[in-house]
Amino acid sequence: MIIIISGPPGSGKTSVAIKLANELSYKFISAGKIFRDIAQKMGLDIINLNKVAESNFDIDKMVDKKIFEFILSEKNLIIESHIAGWLFREYTNIAIYLWAPLKIRANRIAIRDKISYDQAISQIIKREYMHYKRFNKFYGIDINDLSVFDLVINTSNVDVNNIVKLILTYLSLVSQNPQPLKEKDINDK
């Protein structure tokens, strides 16, 4: 089974994806890590690489290619990515979107990155604006359209362990009814 975990910065997607991969003994791949590795090789931070990526689609294509290689080669995979839910949905089994209000995400990032809350807010707003513009320009994706996701979870009041339990419960329910209902079946009920 291939599962995508998407969401904005600070939503908990990396923590949840790692824990879920461990629980299921699945391989874990992070688009964020691939992107950070590219930034490091180029001597840039994330914000500046995002700025470069606004005009250089090759950066995103490198990340996408790497993820797609994993999709083709792995049977059991957790993909953590901002946009994989939109890009690779047809090649995966389940797509999950995690989110939380801006203030909560900023607080998480401030603690994680040891920066001020104001710096975290500024960083998130810049990144999200750049993502929105870039993903719309290069992919035609509206990151506010969550209709491609099977499950959307507000992570603000739930810890990582319980989010993973919720996802595992969902996966169990889905595996009991793997075939989607046909329109005729819905109308007959």
UniProtKB/Swiss-Prot annotation:
Assigned EC number: 2.7.4.25
Keyword ATP-binding applies: yes
Subcellular location: Cytoplasm
Stated family: Belongs to the cytidylate kinase family. Type 2 subfamily.
UniProt catalytic activity: CMP + ATP = CDP + ADP; dCMP + ATP = dCDP + ADP
Keywords: ATP-binding, Cytoplasm, Kinase, Nucleotide-binding, Transferase
Protein name: Cytidylate kinase
Any one of the GO CC terms: cytoplasm
Annotated residues for binding of ATP: G7, P8, P9, G10, S11, G12, K13, T14, S15
Top-rank lineage group of the source organism: Archaea
GO biological process: pyrimidine nucleotide metabolic process
Main location group: cytoplasm
GO function terms (MF aspect): ATP binding; CMP kinase activity; dCMP kinase activity
CDD domains: CMPK
The keyword Cytoplasm appears for this protein: yes
